Amino acid sequence: MDVQTRDGRSRNHPGYLWQYGTPGGAAIFEFRMGRGREGPMRFLENFAGILQTDAYAAYDRVGGPKMVHAACWAHSRRRFVEAIKLNQQDVASTRIVAQMAKLFAIDAQARDENMNFAARHALRRQRAPSVLSELKAQIEAASRTALPSSPLGKASSYTLRLWHKLTRFFDYAELELSNNLAENSMRPVAIGRRNWTHIGHEKAGPRVAAILSIVETCRRLKIPVREYLAAVLPGLANLSFQRLPELTPTAWAATNL
């Protein structure tokens, strides 16, 4: 998003919102004036768990020894879909997208049947190996025949390069196939960017991030935002700093919903 310069006359400069979150949990936005790895490196310095991202290079050196880095199948699929849009006769991309649909269908079945992680893990182990084997064979075949600079060639290279990260879900039942949840959380930012035009000062960035964190966490937890704010704001000034965690959307939902 554009950030207005201090004098208000010079050209605006870019600011960036980074978003971190967990399925069924909070969404945390962090404002940074740069797009380099310094932001996620600092935020995730002591993180122990699974980090699912796209292939942006800034994520390659973040996290500690207890962090597992996973990739997103939706980002891979999108590249083959774009190849089809550019060439309707791209049989290889069409077949690959159809094979990916079989992979997503496994998790769709788990959702439809309200499976817990253990049951989903068993279903994946039963059905995913053959799907993945055929999918990888199709992509490897495409990579041998497509020009490296073509959309199909780039999509194939991208997917094969990230294959070990894309298949992490096979070992971690709690890992989703895609990080669409995070991408969906960024849509209000994209809409707002068109409406806001810019933010007035870089010091306003963290405040914007805090507001977005509260609103998006409420949305994820199905908390009525107005009801939540009406409940927590009146007593906020009289609450000690140590007790502020009691007023987060997650904590409030645990006792009020």
Where are these regions (language model features)?
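Catalytic center-proximal scaffold of phosphoryl-transfer enzymes
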Residues: M1-L257
